[in-house]
Amino acid sequence: MVMEVPREIIEKLEIFQKLVKKWNKSINLVSDNTIHNFWQRHILDSLQLIQYIDNKEIHLVDIGSGSGLPGIVLSIAGVAQVSLIEADLRKCIFLEKASKISNNNIQIINQRIEKIEIDCSILTCRAFSNLNTIFNCIKNISVREKFLLLKGKNYLTEIVEAKERWLFGYLIHQSITCEEGKILEVSNLTKMI
């Protein structure tokens, strides 16, 4: 699949890439092993979620946002309102600086996810945790539409384990950046009694 991205968005994403690389020297935002392939591994990996967002005039919450992936990338790509939840104050300082690259509204929340009460249309996360942990952490977050979760090779095990405690619908989409990568589109999440 080829993604057509307007030049002005590419330019902003390039600025974001430079900022992440600069800050990564002092606070660990992304693995050093991925810096050489940053555009493919991080920018495109995050940007591919935009194809599953029909209406960009929404509120999207990104949990464990540390490096701004995918939240800031999706904001730059046109999502109107993004909240980035990150517990590490140093990473929040980075996110505050990076948020200025986007023309859209970005809110940085420096708290643990479990303590946040917020509602959104879509919730995202990348390299955060397994499904059970994600679902347990977001008890106070109301997700009206769906979750878009970037997952790796253990996604099926995560689904099976989560299905023991939770009811939810899901679609599995192939990542365009990694053969083992998947995008889980989760909806109608309810905890089993």
Swiss-Prot record:
GO cellular component: cytosol
Chief site of localization: cytoplasm
A Pfam family that the UniProt record links to this protein: GidB
InterPro entries named in the record: rRNA_ssu_MeTfrase_G, SAM-dependent_MTases_sf
Homology family: Belongs to the methyltransferase superfamily. RNA methyltransferase RsmG family.
Catalysed reactions, as listed in the record: guanosine(527) in 16S rRNA + S-adenosyl-L-methionine = N(7)-methylguanosine(527) in 16S rRNA + S-adenosyl-L-homocysteine
Compartments, record wording: Cytoplasm
Classification of source organism: Bacteria, Pseudomonadati, Pseudomonadota, Alphaproteobacteria, Rickettsiales
Keywords, sorted A to Z: Cytoplasm, Methyltransferase, rRNA processing, S-adenosyl-L-methionine, Transferase
Functional note: Specifically methylates the N7 position of guanine in position 527 of 16S rRNA.
NCBIfam families attached to this UniProt entry: rsmG_gidB (TIGR00138)
Binding residues annotated for S-adenosyl-L-methionine, in chain numbering: 64, 69, 113-114, 126
EC number(s) reported in the record: 2.1.1.170
An annotated Gene Ontology molecular function: rRNA (guanine-N7-)-methyltransferase activity
Protein's name according to its UniProt entry: Ribosomal RNA small subunit methyltransferase G
